[in-house]
A protein has these predicted regions:
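Glycine-rich beta-alpha junction loops
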Residues: 39-41, 131-132, 156-163, 197-205, ...
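A glycine-rich, Thr/Ser-enriched phosphate-binding loop motif common to dinucleotide/cofactor-binding enzymes
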Residues: 124-135, 208-217, 322-326
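Oxyanion-binding "anion nests"
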Residues: 194-241
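Active-site-proximal catalytic alpha-helix in oxidoreductases
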Residues: 170, 191-199, 241-245, 250
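C-terminal active-site/capping subdomain that shapes the small-molecule cofactor and substrate pocket
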Residues: 231-343
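Helix-loop-beta segment of a Rossmann-like dinucleotide-binding subdomain
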Residues: 120-127, 196-207, 312-314
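A short glycine-/small-residue-rich loop at the edge of a beta-strand within enzyme catalytic domains
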Residues: 10, 184, 188, 204-211, ...
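N-terminal Rossmann-like NAD(P) cofactor-binding subdomain of oxidoreductases
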Residues: 1-193, 228-230, 263, 281, ...
Length: 343
């Protein structure tokens, strides 16, 4: 593929930094990289291919210079600047939740619905799903295609990096304070996160669910193109730095054996099956997922309470596959299949 210019908006954040690293490690054909951020971060330096690149001020950047823009600087920034970039001819791949529910903007996981990328022509924007939705659907897509899924019950155990750098620092700081006999002093989260579990991610909705939980419902239905699939989530923040875990329980339309499910998962793109019935024969966020690209699946077993039930344990790096990697994978398909004529 012919090299193209790429802009990374939010280049100094955790996801932006990961995007730049993944562009390099996957040898994405970047001609010139434009790291962008707010005025207070402009002037900082990021490394790409062994060279220092100066972070530019997003507010003054001319997006007509680049055909692809990876956005991960928060919903308000995307709301303001993604349409500006798109109107200048830059296809925006947005990692925030701002555009995900818009009917004319595709919501894409390349292993699940790559064909939806074609709809970028509507507004010049492609939305990246929520990190928990990505991991779950990469694991469930082969099962959904084979036997159908009527209902998903899922409990997530989400790392603090999903909140951002301040949350990573808060967990580290609280852990040190508590081990030294000091009060935890929560600021990012409403309660202590160190040595704790908080069943509250994003704002509470009128129905008692949080917005994070409802994202998993809306996004699953949109990505699969199945408004009838039922999703019942509980999202929990846990004291882990990187890597989300999910206990997933599905009810299938047609019966499927554990052996059939394992075979489908072993052959699935983007999935690594680690499922031995022994101590340590399963993936965890820290030992397998953190810093890795695949979605790991283990604890595959029949639901003893339901004739068409199946249980899985799913883990993935929320900053990589849950955000930065998925965005770069979208860009790869976009460039190879739709933008090849870009000069």
């Amino acid at each position: 593929m012919k090299p193209v210019n790429v802009a990374v908006v939010g280049a100094t954040g955790a996801v932006g930094e990961a995007m730049i690293e993944i562009l390099e490690s996957r040898e994405f054909p970047v001609d010139t990289l434009y790291p962008l951020a707010s005025s207070r971060s402009a002037g900082k330096s990021v490394q790409f291919r062994g060279k220092h690149n100066t972070v530019q001020d997003l507010s003054t950047f001319d997006f007509s210079q680049t055909p692809i823009g990876l956005f991960s600087a928060g919903g308000d920034i995307s709301a303001e600047y993604a349409p500006i970039a798109a109107s200048a001819g830059c296809v925006v791949i947005d990692n925030t939740s701002h555009f995900r529910r818009d009917k004319d903007i595709p919501l894409v996981i390349p292993e699940v619905n790559p064909e939806a990328i074609a709809d970028y022509r509507s507004r010049g924007i492609i939305a990246n799903p929520n990190c928990s939705t990505i991991g779950m659907l990469v694991a469930l897509k082969p099962l959904y295609d084979a036997v159908g899924i009527e209902r998903i019950n899922v409990a997530t155990y989400q790392a603090v990096s999903g909140t951002g750098k301040a949350a990573i620092e808060e967990l580290a700081g609280q852990t040190a304070r508590l081990l030294n006999g000091k009060a935890p002093e929560p600021e990012v989260y409403p309660k202590q996160i160190a040595f704790n579990a908080i069943p509250h991610i994003d704002a509470f909705q009128d129905n008692g669910y949080t917005r994070e939980e409802m994202k998993m419902v809306w996004e699953t239905q949109k990505i699969l193109g199945d408004p009838n699939i039922l999703v019942n989530p509980t999202c929990v923040r846990v004291p882990v730095f990187f890597g989300h875990a999910e206990a997933v329980h599905i009810e299938t339309r047609e019966p499927i054996s554990v052996e059939q499910a394992r075979s489908l998962l072993e052959a699935a793109e983007g999935v690594t099956l680690l499922d031995r019935h022994e101590a340590g024969g399963y993936p965890t966020p820290v030992t397998e997922a953190a810093g890795a690209d695949p979605v790991f699946v283990g604890r595959v077993r029949a639901d003893i309470s339901h004739p068409r039930g199946l249980n899985l344990w799913v883990v993935a790096d929320n900053v990589r596959k849950g955000a930065a990697l998925n965005s770069v994978q979208i860009a790869e398909v976009l460039l190879s299949e739709y933008l090849q004529s870009v000069s």
